[in-house]
Structure formats: structure tokens, C-alpha cells
A protein has these predicted regions:
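N-proximal low-complexity "stem/linker" segments adjacent to membrane-targeting elements
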Residues: 1-72
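Cell-envelope/extracellular polymer assembly enzymes that use nucleotide-activated donors
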Residues: 52-55, 85, 231
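Long helical/loop segments within the catalytic core of UDP-sugar-dependent glycosyltransferases
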Residues: 110-121, 125, 129, 133, ...
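Short, acidic, metal-binding catalytic loop of nucleotide-sugar glycosyltransferases
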Residues: 72-83
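Short beta-strand-to-loop acidic/aromatic patch adjacent to the donor-nucleotide binding site
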Residues: 132-144
Length: 390
């Protein structure tokens, strides 16, 4: 009797974990398919001769170390100066930092929030910054872009109302940063590139985002959690707005480089994932009836087991089963093999060797993530800040 119960538990657990592995493996394979170049936006931009008027928002909470460099680099754009406005929302930054920012050709906002959040900063900016804009770009305070960033976006804005740029690592100074950068590229491959290749919407990532001004203003005031990017994504997909992924428009982002920051970052992400899942689930019946495939897919994403946990969980179960119940172990090794191949495919070739050298750091990081699970509060809307250095 006890063996029957254990076998049932084994099968149920395998099915639950297999769902996450199969999802990752499926989109990893899709990412290998050839994609025709998208010339629609180029033709539309050429015909309309459009020069988009951009509002660039930098929500900056306690970001004194990085914000000045990021803004100075952005101001090197090869785009017409009178067609973009940079607004920094300075929240809890030092007076000395604000004085330097005031000397730059930007709009500096200095709100005072009882409880700070990125959503509140963006809402404040949309209320305070006046002007005739076509599109809004959201960047984090540590983000650095190339001089042709706006010129590239201008082309896509002729066709798409929501664009996610290619956010990639600007630092690889230790094991944590390397693994965080590799994780970002895996997400880019699975949730952005592969999804677009199937005609599905890209996932948003919190920065390097561009929206039509009207669309953003209609939705930004609906944001209320610390996972504002997931909230925005769910709102857009429920409205059937397609999100375009722009792999050639790079936004260089600082990766977390210490375990405490990693734990805080993952705590924020895991809380946002649970909040998003619980918020989306009641809308699923309506989404099914109206054929909102992107919204359904997004809800499935929120139910996936985080990959780092998946790697350690599968590895641990496979070894334990091999030692204790060899007859039940094969299916677990198959899943682990599928996951390993999928991750190999989704990591860019230039990062593979460097990433796999750091694989032994994963268990320690996963342990910190597991600790987070005990502290997740689905009703928590507090902003969990991770510090930046570069």
C-alpha cells in the first residue's frame, strides 16, 4: 500500500515538473527556426517619414551611483534633440546628485512618496511632464544605450504600439553576475524571440520598454504592485495589444553581483509572479471564450517553476531516485536531460562556456530563493530595491 501511494506521489510530482520543462523545451526549439527579416516597419517609416516624439522616463530610487552616467550617455543620441525629452524621477536621491542633474538638458522631478515604487514614479511623471509626445520609453537608472537607440525605435514605432528592447548584461564581474546575465538571455530567447516567431507577444522585462504615449497613459495609473511590468503586460494582452521584441535594439543593464542583491531581486520577482498569477486566473474563462491566446499563454508563464529551482530540484530528485528506487529514476533523468538541452540552446553561444563554468554556484543561489518562498506575501505592494554600482 505504501509503495502505491509513493508511486502516485512520484507520478504527480513528475507531471507538475514536466509541465515547466516541456514549456521551456518547446520554445527553445521554436527559437531555432529561421525568422524572416521584418521589413514592414522599415517600409512604414519610409513612407510616413515619421520622426517620433519620445518621452524618456528614468524612475530613480536611491540611484546616486549610476543615474548621472546613464543620463549623460543617453544624451549622446544621434536623434533630433527637439524630438525627445528625458525626465528623471529622483526619489530619495542626494541633493548633490540632483544639483548635477539640474545642469543637464533634462526634466528633473523630485516627488516625495510615503511608500516609493516604480509605478508611482511613472504615474507622477505622466502627470507632471507636459508636452506633445508620441511614445514613452522606460529605462532603469543603470541602463545604458547606444547613440542610435531612438533612431532604431523610431522605425518600429511606425507599426507597433508596444516594444520590448533587448536587455543584456553590461557586467560579468563574478559568478552571480554571469549567471544573472545568462538567465536574462534565456528569458530573451524563450519568452521574447521564440514567442514572436510563433506570432505571440513578447514578455516585458521592466526596462527598455517603449509604448505609444496614449496607450501608456491609459494603463499606467492602473498599476499598483511592485511587479509593474507584469501588471502592464497583463493589461496590454487583455486588451489584445501585441508586444514586439526588438533583438537588435540593445539596452545594457547591470546584473546583480552579490548574493544579498540576488535574493532581494528574486524575492521581488517571485512575489510579482504569484500576484500576477492570482490576478490573471479569474480572467481565464473570459480569455478562453474570446480567444485571447496571448493572455492565456502569459498566465501559464506565471505558473511555471522558476528555472534555477527547476535545475536543482530535478537534479536532486534524479540522484535520490537513482540511489533509492532505481526503477523509477529514468523518467526523471529524461526530464533533466530535456531541460539541459533546452538551456544549452537558449544561452547565446558566446556565453555558454562562461555560464557552465559557474554552474556550481546555482545551488547556493537556489537556497536563497527557497528561503524567499517562506516570506512571499501576495498582498505585499512594497518596493524591494536592489542597489546598482556601475
Amino acid at each position: 500500500m505504501i509503495w502505491t501511494i509513493l508511486h502516485i506521489i512520484d507520478i504527480i510530482l513528475w507531471i507538475i515538473i514536466a509541465g515547466s520543462v516541456i514549456y521551456v523545451a518547446f520554445f527553445a526549439i521554436i527559437s531555432l527556426f529561421y525568422e524572416k527579416e521584418d521589413h514592414v516597419a522599415e517600409h512604414a517609416a519610409a513612407i510616413s517619414n515619421r520622426v517620433t516624439r519620445f518621452l524618456i522616463l528614468y524612475p530613480a530610487y536611491n540611484e546616486d551611483r549610476v543615474i548621472i552616467h546613464a543620463v549623460e550617455q543617453f544624451l549622446l543620441q544621434d536623434y533630433p534633440k527637439d524630438h525627445y525629452t528625458v525626465a528623471v524621477i529622483s526619489d530619495h536621491m542626494q541633493p548633490e546628485t540632483n544639483e548635477i542633474l539640474k545642469e543637464l538638458p533634462i526634466t528633473l522631478l523630485t516627488p516625495t512618496f510615503e511608500k516609493s515604487s516604480k509605478a508611482k514614479a511613472m504615474q507622477y511623471a505622466m502627470t507632471e511632464v507636459q508636452g506633445n509626445f508620441d511614445n514613452v520609453v522606460i529605462l532603469d537608472a543603470d541602463n545604458v544605450v547606444r547613440p542610435n537607440f531612438l533612431s532604431q525605435l523610431n522605425i518600429l514605432c511606425s507599426v507597433y504600439d508596444a516594444i520590448q528592447c533587448h536587455r543584456c548584461a553590461k557586467n560579468a564581474n563574478n559568478d552571480v553576475a554571469v549567471l544573472d546575465g545568462a538567465s536574462e538571455e534565456i528569458n530573451n530567447t524563450i519568452f521574447r524571440k521564440a514567442h514572436n516567431r510563433l506570432g505571440l507577444s513578447s514578455a516585458l522585462i521592466g526596462s527598455g520598454m517603449c509604448f505609444s504615449y496614449k496607450l501608456f497613459k491609459e494603463n499606467v495609473f492602473k498599476l499598483s504592485t511592485a511587479g509593474e511590468d507584469r501588471e502592464m503586460e497583463a493589461l496590454l494582452l487583455h486588451q489584445e495589444v501585441f508586444i514586439k521584441y526588438a533583438p537588435d535594439i540593445h539596452v545594457f543593464d547591470e546584473k546583480v553581483s552579490n548574493q544579498d542583491n540576488f535574493q532581494r531581486q528574486r524575492m521581488r520577482w517571485m512575489t510579482a509572479q504569484i500576484q500576477s498569477l492570482l490576478s490573471n486566473l479569474p480572467k481565464i474563462p473570459g480569455a478562453i471564450i474570446h480567444g485571447k491566446v496571448n493572455f492565456i499563454d502569459k498566465t501559464i508563464q506565471q505558473a511555471l517553476i522558476p528555472r534555477s529551482i527547476l535545475i536543482v530540484l530535478l537534479g536532486g530528485i534524479s540522484i535520490i531516485m537513482t540511489l533509492l528506487i532505481p526503477a523509477w529514476c529514468e523518467k526523471w533523468w529524461v526530464l533533466l536531460g530535456m531541460l539541459a538541452v533546452a538551456l544549452y540552446i537558449t544561452i547565446p553561444s558566446q556565453l555558454r562556456l562562461q555560464s557552465f563554468k559557474k554552474v556550481f554556484s546555482i545551488p547556493g543561489l537556489v537556497l536563497r530563493m527557497m528561503k524567499n518562498i517562506l516570506h512571499i506575501d501576495r498582498n505585499n505592494t512594497d518596493f524591494i530595491h536592489t542597489t546598482h554600482e556601475k
